[in-house]
Each structure stands twice: as C-alpha cells, then as structure tokens.
Amino acid sequence: MEKSLNELLADEAELQDVLVNPTLPRFVVLPTREPIPLSTEVLSSPAVSHLISDLRDRYNSRIVIFDLPPVLSSDDVITVLPKFDCVLLVVANGMNSKKEIEESLHHLANANLIGTVLNKAEPQNRSYY
C-alpha cells in the first residue's frame, strides 16, 4: 500500500490510487495508514463530503461500509452520521454495558439503524432441546 485515505484527504492522491482490491470479488478497501489528526474536523470537511459522493457515484450498485470509532468514544460518528444512508451498530461481546448500548442507541435515534452485530462472540454448540 503506497497511498491511503491520509494522502487522499491531504489532496496528495486520487481515489483510484488509494483503493485496494483484495481477492474477494466486488470488494474494495480504502485503507488508512495512521490515525487522522483532528478526525472530527476532517470528517465534517468538504473533502469527506466529496469522498462520500464520489464513492456513491462510483459504487452505486454496492454497499459502502465506513468503519468508525465507537459512538461514545468521540464525536466522529455524530459528525458524519447525516451523510450516511444507514447505520449498522457493532457491539463487542462482553465489552459494552447495557447502559453504553442504550446511550449509543440514543445517539443514533435519528439515524436509519438497520441492525446490530454482536462481534467477538465465541461460537457455542447447543443442542436443539
């Protein structure tokens, strides 16, 4: 990976130069090399709005997923949320309290929440009865 989202947002690369095609068909990744300083400000910038529009136009028949920090850890999610069509809440098994989940849902009250994923759960074999 020579260039990433960092260079794209710094206007040092074009979108097609930072997209990575892993071996999965119809799957593209836009990686980040390092944390973006002042991420809340960056996410509210015209550059990110343009990026989202560009991805919408380029991949109009696909689903675009943005992996963001936890809702309660920063303002990043709240800042960029109005730009998204829908939201999928990811809850880490054993790491989030009921209160934290409820508070996260409160922050997402005006979003088009399409579901919740329980992540980091250990599979358990159970009999039907």
Please annotate each region the language model reported.
Residues 1-129:
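P-loop NTP-binding module
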